[in-house]
């Protein structure tokens, strides 16, 4: 009897150990060239660092194919921060491991590094930043499908992002329903039109290298201008600010407004109807973002477009890791093939 019990215990321990090893995915760091990013006036490399999370069974499964979630990080952030290389409020591989261990369906997670000279690409197409929309939806997706065992169809692809990444997910998602079938927006920034107010600190900057030394909101002005009001004839910044000599510039503000999802969404309603699932959330203490997400919820309701909308007690970052693990990943597990 004792030998039998000991044998069973040994088998249990061995089985547990095997499971512990199996539930940890593998992380790869690759470079994916963007032809549409070549020659950007910021001078950023078109060879972008990309992090790829492969689920635990990927190596051993042989021919199995997996759904893919393309995850976009926020402004001033980088892949190194989101992937746990540098201390940050989130560690994607750890969170995905935990979600899969809790029963969430296995999937591949892909994050391109969109940190640029002006601290963030805004995931927009511009002569100054390069064509980031096309890079994400066309070039990156094509590369991942060619080099990994993916479900190479829109029904197996999701697009998500936080803050600037949430903006990018909606912007790109509205234009590429043939590429993705599910969207999730985490505290998406920049939904509403606006250019703020005159910023004397921004007007005092004439060297691109000085942008990195500026405060967060001044950096955001330059990133937004590079994406939405580029100017190839205005070196060395190659952009137009929405203010000049302390006065707002209506023509530039109009360009910024044209890039606000709440301003452009009406023309993309047929595309949004193509999505199997759309989710979005924001912390109640994250203003004005929570307010604009609520407005987006109202617009989608007006058009009778099915979606999930949730607010929670939190600010812009303090519960993002938890939300990714417990809401976003299960959302895609339920909606992707």
Feature map (PLM): residue ranges:
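Compositionally biased regions
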Residues: 3, 17-18
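Sec-dependent signal peptide recognition
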Residues: 1-7
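Non-catalytic cap/lid and distal C-terminal segments of serine-dependent acyl enzymes
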Residues: 19-337
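N-terminal signal peptide c-region/cleavage motif recognized by signal peptidases
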Residues: 13-15
């Amino acid at each position: 009897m004792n030998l039998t019990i000991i044998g069973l215990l040994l088998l249990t321990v061995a089985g547990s150990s095997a499971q512990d090893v199996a539930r940890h995915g593998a992380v790869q760091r690759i470079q994916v060239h963007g032809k549409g990013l070549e020659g950007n006036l910021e001078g950023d490399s078109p060879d972008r660092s990309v992090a790829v999370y492969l689920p635990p069974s990927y190596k051993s499964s042989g021919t199995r194919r997996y759904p893919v979630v393309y995850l976009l990080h926020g402004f001033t952030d980088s892949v190194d921060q989101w992937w746990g290389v540098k201390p940050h409020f989130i560690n994607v591989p750890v969170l995905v491991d935990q979600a899969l261990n809790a029963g969430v369906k296995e999937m591949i997670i892909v994050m391109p590094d969109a940190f640029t000279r002006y601290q963030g690409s805004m995931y927009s197409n511009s002569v100054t930043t390069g064509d980031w929309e096309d890079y994400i939806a066309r070039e990156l997706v094509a590369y991942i499908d060619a080099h990994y065992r993916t479900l190479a169809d829109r029904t197996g692809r999701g697009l998500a992002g936080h803050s600037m990444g949430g903006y990018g997910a909606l912007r790109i998602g509205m234009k590429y329903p043939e590429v993705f079938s599910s969207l999730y927006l985490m505290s998406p920034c920049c939904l509403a039109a606006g250019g703020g107010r005159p910023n004397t600190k921004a007007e005092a900057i004439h060297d691109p290298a000085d942008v990195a030394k500026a405060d967060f909101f001044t950096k955001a002005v330059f990133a937004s201008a590079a994406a939405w009001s580029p100017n190839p004839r205005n070196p060395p910044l190659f952009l137009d600010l929405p203010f000049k000599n302390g006065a707002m510039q209506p023509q530039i503000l109009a360009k910024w407004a044209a890039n606000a999802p709440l301003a452009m969404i009406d023309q993309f309603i047929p595309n949004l109807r193509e999505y199997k699932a759309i989710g979005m959330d924001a912390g109640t203490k994250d203003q004005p973002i929570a307010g604009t997400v609520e407005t987006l919820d109202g617009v989608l309701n007006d058009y009778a477009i099915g979606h999930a909308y949730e607010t929670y007690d939190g600010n812009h970052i303090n519960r993002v890791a938890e939300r990714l693990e417990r809401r976003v990943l299960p959302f895609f597990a339920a909606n992707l093939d």
